[in-house]
Amino acid sequence: MVNNVTDISFKNEVLESDLPVIVDFWAEWCGPCKMLIPIIDEISKELQDKVKVLKMNIDENPKTPSEYGVRSIPTIMLFKNGEQKDTKIGLQQKKSLLDWINKSI
C-alpha cells in the first residue's frame, strides 16, 4: 500500500528524502486516478528499494499541487535530491511508468 503525503509532511517526506520520490497527485472524484491506484501500488512494491512512492489528495492538500503547477490529475511527479525532475500527466500504463522511472533515477 502506498503512503499518503500532506502539505505539512511534503518537505520531510519528499524534498528531504534520501531516495528518489514518486508523488501521485489525485482526487477521490477522479476516475482515471482510481484506475491508476493498482498500477501505483504494484510499482511501489516492485521498486521499494529504489524509490519512495507517495500519494497526495489535492482536495485535502491544495497548497503543494498549486506550488508545483498541478493543473490536471492524475499527475505523477518524480523528485530527486529535493528537486522536481520530471512529470507525467494522465493515466499511464505500468510499463510506460516503469520505463520512465528507471530512466529518471
Curated annotation (Swiss-Prot):
Keywords: Disulfide bond, Electron transport, Redox-active center, Transport. One of its GO terms (cellular component) is cytoplasm. Disulfide bonds join C30-C33. Pfam families: Thioredoxin. InterPro entries: Thioredoxin (IPR005746), Thioredoxin-like_sf (IPR036249), Thioredoxin_CS (IPR017937), Thioredoxin_domain (IPR013766). Component of the thioredoxin-thioredoxin reductase system. Participates in various redox reactions through the reversible oxidation of its active center dithiol to a disulfide and catalyzes dithiol-disulfide exchange reactions. PANTHER family: GEO12009P1. This is Thioredoxin. The keyword Metal-binding does not apply. The keyword Disulfide bond applies. PROSITE patterns: THIOREDOXIN_1 (PS00194), THIOREDOXIN_2 (PS51352). It comes from Rickettsia typhi (strain ATCC VR-144 / Wilmington). One of its GO terms (molecular function) is protein-disulfide reductase activity. It comes from the Bacteria. Residues 1-105 form the Thioredoxin domain. Belongs to the thioredoxin family. NCBIfam families: thioredoxin.
